[in-house]
Design a protein with these regions (language model features):
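Divalent metal-cofactor coordination and adjacent catalytic microenvironments
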Residues: 1-90
Length: 90
């Protein structure tokens, strides 16, 4: 879904120091989206909504102890509902 460079940009990180932590998070996003919403990309192309949800998930999972996690979780919940609805229309 994201390259390591894109993930670092999303997380606003410089350097490769945390790549060992970031790689598994990147790999976990697509199966998580499919398990929670039934969404899988058409021809490997993710919808803008799925990409946005993935970005927020990456932030939540990486910065799990941040004070804004409740806000992030609410946004993610709304995005996942919308993604499930989008899948239902396809």
């Amino acid at each position: 879904m994201f390259t390591i460079e894109e993930a670092r940009e999303i997380l606003r990180l410089d350097g490769a120091d945390n790549d060992a932590i970031i790689y598994p998070l990147i790999e976990a996003i697509p199966p998580y989206l499919e398990a929670t919403t039934g969404y899988s990309p058409a021809d490997g192309d993710y919808s803008p909504l799925a990409i946005t949800a993935g970005q927020f998930l990456l932030q939540l999972w990486y910065f799990g102890e941040n004070s804004d996690t409740d806000k992030l979780q609410r946004v993610i919940d709304c995005l996942l509902k919308a993604l499930a609805a989008e899948r239902g229309k396809a």
